[in-house]
Amino acid sequence: VSDAVNSAIPVNPFCHVLFDQPVIPGNTGNTIRQCAGTGAALHLAGPLGFNFDDKHVKRAGLDYHDLASVTLHENRDAALAELADEGGHRVFAFTAHADTWFTDITYEPGDVLLFGTEPTGLEQEALDDPRVTQQVRIPMLPGRRSMNLANAAAVATYEAWRQAGFPGAV
């Protein structure tokens, strides 16, 4: 299911945020709002752990749903087929196990920021996918397992947007 045509949504987003099998509706709702505010496109790879019409998704996204580009994909493979295979975009897989910090990357228009499900992160199969350009991490203090999905996506998206010069921002 692709998003409807809306003149408020950028035709060529500066980056694509891809959630693989998200399970917490509030995180997806928050990220819809964040993507609406930055011009990034959100892609959700199923199966989703919630109904997309869930009241928590709607509440977290407030009235930004019509201002965001959101595309639902059957699974991660279908999403990567569209974005990486057909679109030719680079894919950065965010994982706590990578050595490279996400700020060490020079982002390019159309890059894909790939995040795993909330309880476990990206599966090894996703990390090993040949379409993944590089695995990257958001630095944290020692002994911390992970960040909240919506927060991690926001941190990464704003870095990519900053590097792009905040196109369209006021």
Feature roles, as predicted:
Residues V1-V170:
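Post-transcriptional modification and biogenesis factors for structured RNAs
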